[in-house]
Amino acid sequence: MVYLQLVCFPKEVVPIAITSASLPAKRRILTVCVKLFLEKGYKRTTVAEIVQKADVSNSTFQNIFRAKDGVLTELVEFMFDNQFGMARRITDADLPPVFVYAVETAIQLTLTELNENLRELYTEAYTQKEASEYIRRAMARELYGIFGLYQPTLSEEDFYALEIGSAGM
């Protein structure tokens, strides 16, 4: 049995057991959700549609994700990690790290302009507790790595506080 940890609140973790038997169901659910969220939007997609199209039971869905917002958090983690990874691949290694941040921001802006339903996903991610907490923690780590050299007196936790403040603007 593999245990995954989902961040709910700072320093509080809820372990969810994922067995090798449930991994195919998880993949199907995520694939269906991406398709439905992009086609219909997050709010207009129901759990009933998801379980029907993913060919899983309600209990399987709930055991893996608890609720639709659990799927959103999983997708946020994937997107966040991939956006910074993409930004790193795009920027030249000789450029200052701040360019990675600029490119990642441009990627986010471009993605939200491409599709209204994708824009809705971003809005949901930043308003739901679990997803937004993941974003703030992960962004603080990235910002600390990028700007820590310019702000040597600040810790990663300071960057977390700055992220909370600037995210509310």
Language-model region placement:
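Hydrophobic alpha-helical connector segments
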Residues: E74, G85-L118, R136-A138
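Short linear capping/connector segments at secondary-structure termini
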Residues: R88, L121-Q128
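Helix-turn-helix
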Residues: R28, L36-G70, E74
